[in-house]
Every structure is written in structure tokens, then in C-alpha cells.
Amino acid sequence: MEENIIHESEEKKSVSFIEQKVINDLAEGKNGGRLQTRFPPEPNGYLHIGHAKAIAIDFGLAKKYNGTCNLRFDDTNPIKEDTEYIESIENDIKWLGFQWANVYYASDYFQELWDFAVWLIKQGRAYVDEQSSEVIAQQKGTTTSPGTNSPFRDRPVEENLKLFEFMNSGKCEPGTLVLRAKIDMAHPNMLFRDPLIYRVLNIPHIRTGNKWNAYPMYDFTHGQSDYLEGVTHSWCTLEFVEHRPLYDLFVTWMKEWKGETDNIEDNRPRQTEFNKLNLNYTLMSKRNLLALVNEKLVNGWDDPRMPTICGFRRRGYSPESIIKFIDKIGYTKIDALNDMALLESAVRDDLNSRALRVSAVLNPVKVVLTNYPEGQLEQLTAVNNPENEADGTHEVEFSRELWIERDDFMKEADKKFMRLAPGKEVRLKNAYIIKCNEEHPCDEDENGNVTTIYCTYDPESRSGLPGSNRKIKGKTLHWVSCHNAVKAEVRLYDRLWKVENPRDTLADLREEQNCDAVTAMKQMINPNSLSILKDCFIEPFAASMKPLTYLQFQRIGYFTPDSDSTAEKPVFNKTVGLKDTWAKINK
């Protein structure tokens, strides 16, 4: 499908079409006036920001309308599942600010699903097929031509029952037998052409062990699990639109099996689809993300360049900023490619109100204040957050020798350069006005690199004194005292991919070059997605912060201490710059 890039969300309506449906259903008394939702992730990888969109509506609307939302792990494929993923999913949901009513697993229903499948066989609505997957696929037909019935479609019920038992015996080879629902091989919806509902895997399950060797397929599990739990509203993404009629049919059959046919159209889950969260310069397929991790093209699932929730968390995104972004782009029935600038804008706006302001110099050069007393140290006051007075203040040390950014000095500058230059004045944040010497303004090494800048300070201009009101043309610079500066590593992140739509480019490269996904991805990765600065200086107040603390390095951007950070070696991740680095957002 052709995707439009959304650079700016349109004016948001009061409620989404999904929320309006909830309002209508509750008003009409459907499902007894109840609202019960579920978030059903597969425990086969870490959640990404696309999952956050589903989490926000599943949990958010349930809370808003006094309903409940359960967490249900869709653990029907033991090949890919791991308890590591289960734990990470639970942590991510909690971090986003939500709490489930109950935790369930699709495997909780394996026995009921098995019994239901046996009933379908006895009703003549399911049969065991022993053709290969290739033959079954060929017999499905096309969207313009009907399929061909399997030669085993009318196998006797007793034979089907015996073969179905054999499928779960542990003696049946995977791929030799499958159970199919008997529906209509000429149905215009290809999913109705006798879909597979059970297959043999012969792999132990992380929860049920060796009890099951035949496992239900997704389409046979999802709706029935919703029904058995009492889910009223089942929300999923647009690729499941064509699955909805099959979802409804299986729920109807299960209601018949349960003998609940008095009101077949009510007291049942209803599926509604919405658009996925797609971002430019982002790839969100769990299969491809796993390949990145396994091939060590990134540093794990929580690499700050990854679109995983734990990656965003490690990078310094707040959960509130992610939810605000999701709320801004909304829920529609049209897939779109959202501009990364919108997400960064939401993060920037949120962190502006919560980040503590600190000083850090990433590319340092020394300044010596020649008229400042040698050995003298001053404790000055810095406001932690001008957006929130309750965050208080902290002390910063001032001394004769300081670190400033190398880009804030120019030996030969024109009139437009408003930072430090020979004969020019600038203001030091929370401190004094200083002036660069006109004669001998700096020392340089043999390569012409500036090593030391010489200035004088105005003792009457300290912040808070009347002299600080003196007007100057120069800008206000950040700085760190050389006396107590802490050396730190700073990691600067850029987009992981060179191409705007890596999903489509990946598919194109694989087709053009007949190569695997990893080979194609290596051609798309941005070689400059991570820059590590090892000779930065920060103030001690910042060095003491723990991971997941939100900081603003003044005049640079938002940062957070990394999980690798220690007292001896602080490490910081850049979250987002103070200005948009992706695209211009028209406001």
C-alpha cells in the first residue's frame, strides 16, 4: 500500500472512531454494558513503539470507561518463545504507566481448544489433511479462481479423531498431518478456504512442557481466547481486516459448542482494526530486529538506536512523551508513515518540563581568567529546572580555570559571531561576564589548534548582583570548572538507517539482489548512527545522577545516564537535541 508521510498531525478529533464505538456499545448495553479488553503480545521478542500504540488504547480506554484490560501472552509457537521476553513485556507495560487486571496465556486454553477441535471433527467441520504444505497452498486457488477440495476432506469422523490424537502423540512428524476447518474452498475470502487450525511441532512448551505436540494456529486461538476470557472489544491492526469474518465464525462455532445460542450475536468479542504506528527511518519487524541483535549490528535489544520500548527508555525517552505522541497521531483506518520529527517533538516538549539543567562540555577547550585570584573557589547557585520551581537548585563551583566548548571560541571572528573572540564579551551561565583578551587571546599547539584561551572577568557582574544586568552583545555560554570537572563519555545517536523507508527498501534490495535480510540491512545501516565522545567534562551534580534521570545539557540537548554508567566513569546517552534535527515541523 502507498503510504503518505505525515509531517504534522491534523487537528485531533475529540474521540477516535474506536472510542466512539466503545461509547455506542456501552450505551446500547452490548455485552451487558461491560468493557473488557486485552493486550495479546507474542513472547518472541521485545516490544517496540508500535506495540505501545496498541497498549495505549487497550489499557487506556479500559481505564477511561471503568473496564478492565488483561495481559494475555499468545504463546502458541514454542519455537520462538522465551521467559526473557515475557519479563521484558511486563516491565515495558509497567514503565509505560499501565497495569493489567489479570495475566493469561493462550496455553491456558489449550485443553479447551483441543476439546473444541474434537467437537468440530465430530460435527463434520474439521478434518485431518496429510498433504504437504506446498500442495495445500496450490489447492487454495486464487482470488479470481476457486480452490480444489483436498482428497481427505471427506475422511470419516472416526478416522479423523484417531489421526488427530496421533498428531499429539509425539510420534507424528511435523508437516505430515494438519487439522483443517471445513468451510468453503470457493469462498471469495481466501482465509475461509479450509484454513489450518492445528499443526504438529513436537517441541516442549515453556509452560506446558511435553503435554502438547500439536499446537493451535493463531486464527484458531485468538478469537476463542478472547471469548473464553470475556473480552468485549478486540483491537488489532489493519492486516487483520480480512481475518475478522473468520474470527467471528470461530466464535460463533464456539458459542454453539458451549450451548450459548440464545443470543448468538451478543455476549461475544468484537474485533476492530486500526492503523499501525509506522515511523520513517525505522524498521519495526521483530524478525528483522532479532536479526540485528543476533548479527551484533546493534548492541542488544535495548540499544538506544532500536525502536524497542526498552531502547527508547535507555535513550532517555519518558513514557509520557511516547503516550503523548501516540495520542497526537491518533487511530485511523489508513496506514501512514509518520515523521520521526513528530516523535522527537513530543519528547522535547515533555522533557522540557521535567529535565534537570546541568552543564556539560563535549568538545572542551580551557579558559583561564587572568584576573581571578589563583586558588579561589566560589559556590554559585544554579536553578535545576526553570519550568518547575519545586525541583530546587544546586551549587556549581567557579574557579580561575574553566572548560568551555571549542566551538564557542573563534580567534578570527566577524561581527556576526556572538560568542567568545578577541575583545568580545560573553556571559557565563549562573556566573560572570568575561572578556577575551585582545592581545595574546590564546595559545595554540604546533598544528594551530587552540589549547588555552585567556580572558578577564567582571567581578561586579555575578548573577544576582546589580552588575549582572549590564547589557552585552555576546551570548550566554555554558561552562564547567576545571577544578572539579568530572570526565565522562557521551554517546551521540543518529538514525540507524540511511533510507527513509527501510521496510520497503529492504524488500526491494532482497528482490533485486536475491539476498537475505541481513545482507540487505548491512547496506542500509547508517555508519554514523553512533558517535562516542570520551573526553567530555561534566559538573559533579550531573555525574551523581542515576540511569533514567532526565537531564538537559544546557545549549546542547537532552541526555540521560546510561546503564553502563559508573561513579568512576559516567556515561551519558543523548536523547534528543534542543532543536529538530529530522525535519521542519510547521506549527
Task: Locate the predicted segments by residue.
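A glycine-rich helix N-cap at a beta->alpha junction
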Residues: Y85-Q111, F116-W119, G124-Y127
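Core subunits and conserved enzymes of cellular information-processing
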Residues: F240, R244, D248-F250, E320, ...
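Residue-level signal for inorganic ion chemistry
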Residues: G29, D58, I89, L120, ...
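Active-site cores that bind ATP or allylic diphosphates and position pyrophosphate for catalysis
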Residues: L71, D75-N77, T83, Y105, ...
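Conserved short loop/turn motifs at secondary-structure junctions
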Residues: P40-P43, R72-K80, N102-Q111, E134, ...
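N-terminal catalytic cores of NTP/NDP-binding nucleotidyl/phosphoryl-transfer enzymes
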Residues: E11-E90, I206-T237
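Long, charged, mostly alpha-helical binding arms that flank functional sites
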Residues: D262-A346
